[in-house]
């Protein structure tokens, strides 16, 4: 990992990945709960 070259770019990527993972997890949980309720 080359953190010394772009120290400001690493946390931004981590934040973006965390946001994408959070949105995906919420969507998956919503689909699962909706399927349980409909069934």
Swiss-Prot record:
SUPFAM superfamilies: Photosystem II reaction center protein L, PsbL
GO annotation (BP), single: photosynthesis
Subcellular location: Cellular thylakoid membrane
Listed transmembrane segments: 18-38
Gene Ontology terms: cellular component: photosystem II reaction center; plasma membrane-derived thylakoid membrane
Membrane topology: Single-pass membrane protein
Keyword set, alphabetical order: Membrane, Photosynthesis, Photosystem II, Reaction center, Thylakoid, Transmembrane, Transmembrane helix
Function: One of the components of the core complex of photosystem II (PSII). PSII is a light-driven water:plastoquinone oxidoreductase that uses light energy to abstract electrons from H(2)O, generating O(2) and a proton gradient subsequently used for ATP formation. It consists of a core antenna complex that captures photons, and an electron transfer chain that converts photonic excitation into a charge separation. This subunit is found at the monomer-monomer interface and is required for correct PSII assembly and/or dimerization.
Known partners and oligomeric status: PSII is composed of 1 copy each of membrane proteins PsbA, PsbB, PsbC, PsbD, PsbE, PsbF, PsbH, PsbI, PsbJ, PsbK, PsbL, PsbM, PsbT, PsbX, PsbY, Psb30/Ycf12, peripheral proteins PsbO, CyanoQ (PsbQ), PsbU, PsbV and a large number of cofactors. It forms dimeric complexes.
Family named by the database record: Belongs to the PsbL family.
Identification of the protein by name: Photosystem II reaction center protein L
């Amino acid at each position: 990992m080359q953190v010394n070259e772009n120290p400001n770019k690493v946390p931004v990527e981590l934040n973006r990945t965390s946001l994408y993972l959070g949105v995906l997890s919420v969507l998956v949980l919503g689909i699962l709960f909706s399927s349980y309720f409909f069934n």
